[in-house]
Amino acid sequence: MKLVEVKHPLVKHKLGLMRAADISTKNFRELATEVGSLLTYEATSDLETEKVIIDGWCGDVEIDRIKGKKVTVVPILRAGLGMMDGVLEHIPSARISVVGMYRNEETLEPVPYFQKLASDLEERLAIVVDPMLATGGSMIATIDLLKQKGCKQIKVLVLVAAPEGIKALEAAHPDIEVYTASIDSHLNEQGYIVPGLGDAGDKIFGTK
């Protein structure tokens, strides 16, 4: 599994702001979008381009254009919605495939409750977004579903990742790529990432 910890100064600065205990919903939400955008920039750096001739203001102009790549953004509900716009800033024509997962707080296992996916997943690069890669259970279940529907190329964007989740995801899906703003220390007894961001979903949506 390809794992990239994006160490750009802007990413580190913005993620650091998100770790503050007293951060407002507005600021957390905006920063989640901004970091998601920067991760997207990194994750799409290997997209293949081709030369195309277009009509320019002074005649024919040769330009580079992304070559035949269809993309679907896959936010894992609900917190993944907070990163979705960051991807769409760069790929506004991407289809949106939604997967609903929540974590059973007693067993820490993922529980699926909703899915609405692009009809042609076998032709698309899927960019899965979720702020936290903790135990890895929800991400593994989501990728299982995408592969069952025919998706062949999958990239994952997360704000923070725990070593435990990385290990589990690599064991289940060694063929994917993961881009994160930080590999944090560990999971606590409640399954939260330390130092992490707290409950990203609550902070994005202003709920408790």
From Swiss-Prot:
Record pathway: Pyrimidine metabolism; UMP biosynthesis via salvage pathway; UMP from uracil: step 1/1
Gene3D superfamilies, per database record: 3.40.50.2020
EC nos: 2.4.2.9
UniProt xrefs under CDD domains: PRTases_typeI
Keyword GTP-binding annotated: yes
One GO BP annotation of this record: uracil salvage
Cofactor(s) named in the record: Mg(2+)
Any GO molecular function: GTP binding
Sites where the protein binds 5-phospho-alpha-D-ribose 1-diphosphate: R78, R103, D130, P131, M132, L133, A134, T135, G136, G137, S138, D199
The protein's role, per its UniProt record: Catalyzes the conversion of uracil and 5-phospho-alpha-D-ribose 1-diphosphate (PRPP) to UMP and diphosphate.
Listed HAMAP family: Upp_B (MF_01218_B)
Family, per entry: Belongs to the UPRTase family.
Name of the protein: Uracil phosphoribosyltransferase
Protein source organism: Actinobacillus succinogenes (strain ATCC 55618 / DSM 22257 / CCUG 43843 / 130Z)
